[in-house]
Structures are given as structure tokens and as C-alpha cells.
């Protein structure tokens, strides 16, 4: 990148000066194969001017708020630039941490006892206990299990009949019709 003739401390340079340098560099950019700078119509147009076209160098950052705000900006960041010009250079647009103050909760917060006290019993602790016995017998031959198995068998037979039995039965029926004719 090329250096501008204006010497400022990099950390204290206003945004307009950076925009001015960027526009200067973009206007004079030369690609590797070209000998002439780019000639874009936007730079020669009477209607449009690049952002920061009429910016004069300032002696210090304290003179930043004296700038004339009547010039028109043609930039997608117009609102951000305008607000930065009105407030002057700042550390952050959101203020500093010291200006925010502390936030105190109106309700006192208590720590969750269940997280640090293993003697407190939860309702679902029996689910994690391997030797828990609730008195039910563990018979796998129940009416519900039998109905579930019967339903699975009927669904399987129905699918087999649909995709295997129906084509076979329709082929047999077609052969019977041919023999009759």
C-alpha cells in the first residue's frame, strides 16, 4: 500500500483520514499487467464523489469535532461515519467497561444443592441404582409382549403378501384366463 503525505499517529487517526487514503489507493490502483491506472467512471462523475473527497488534514484529534458536516457522503456506512464524526474518536462505540457500572441482582441467588451435595436424594435416583428392586417379577412372557409379537408377524405377512403374493396370484390368474380362451 502506498503512503499518504499526511503523517499522523496511526492509533489516533480519524476514520475520514483512513477513508481518504483508501480512496486515493483505489483510484490509483494498477494491476500487474496494466501500465495505466484504472479509469472508472465513478471517479470522473459530477454526481458522485468518493467518501472523504474534500477532507482537509487536521492538526490534532481535538480539532476533530470542528469539521463541517454538510458534505454529502456516498457510502453504505453513512450512518456509522456520521455518528463517528459527531462523537469524535473514541475507544469504543459501546462505551467502556468502567462506564457500565456493576449490575446487582434484586434476588439473591442460591447455589444448586443437588450439584454439590451427594446426600440429597433425587426422585430419579433409583434409575441410576443397579441393585434397586421394586418388587415386580421380571417375566418376559406377558400378554403385552405376546400381542406385540403377533402384530409384528401380521405386518410382516402383509408386506410379503403385497410384494410377493399379489404378483404370483395375478400371474396365475392371467394364465387361467389364457387357457380358457
Curated annotation (Swiss-Prot):
Localization of this protein: Cytoplasm; Membrane
GO molecular function terms noted in the UniProt entry: protein-macromolecule adaptor activity
One cellular component (GO) term of this entry: cell division site
Feature: compositional bias, Acidic residues: 32-47
Region entry Disordered, spans: 25-47
Keywords: Cytoplasm, Membrane, Transmembrane, Transmembrane helix
Pfam family of the protein (one): SKN1_KRE6_Sbg1
InterPro entries in alphabetical order: Skn1/Kre6/Sbg1 (IPR005629)
One record GO biological process: mitotic division septum assembly
Disulfide links within the chain: none
Main location group: cytoplasm
Keyword match Cytoplasm: yes
Transmembrane segments: 149-169
Topology in the lipid bilayer: Single-pass membrane protein
Protein name in UniProt: Uncharacterized protein P22H7.03
Amino acid at each position: 500500500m502506498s503512503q499518504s503525505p499526511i503523517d499522523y499517529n496511526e492509533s489516533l487517526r480519524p476514520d475520514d483520514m483512513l477513508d481518504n487514503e483508501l480512496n486515493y489507493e483505489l483510484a490509483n490502483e494498477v494491476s500487474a499487467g496494466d501500465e495505466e491506472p484504472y479509469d472508472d467512471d465513478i471517479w470522473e462523475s459530477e454526481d458522485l464523489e468518493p467518501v472523504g473527497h474534500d477532507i482537509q488534514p487536521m492538526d490534532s484529534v481535538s480539532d476533530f469535532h470542528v469539521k463541517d458536516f454538510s458534505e454529502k457522503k456516498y457510502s453504505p456506512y453513512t450512518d456509522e461515519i456520521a455518528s463517528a464524526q459527531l462523537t469524535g474518536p473514541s475507544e469504543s462505540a459501546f462505551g467502556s467497561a468502567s462506564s457500565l457500572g456493576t449490575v446487582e441482582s434484586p434476588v439473591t441467588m442460591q447455589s444448586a444443592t443437588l450439584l454439590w451435595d451427594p446426600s440429597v436424594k433425587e426422585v430419579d435416583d433409583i434409575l441410576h441404582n443397579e441393585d434397586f428392586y421394586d418388587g415386580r417379577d421380571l417375566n418376559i412372557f406377558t400378554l403385552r409382549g405376546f400381542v406385540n409379537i403377533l402384530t409384528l408377524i401380521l405386518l410382516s405377512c402383509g408386506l410379503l403378501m403385497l410384494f410377493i403374493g399379489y404378483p404370483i396370484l395375478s400371474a396365475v390368474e392371467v394364465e387361467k384366463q389364457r387357457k380358457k380362451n
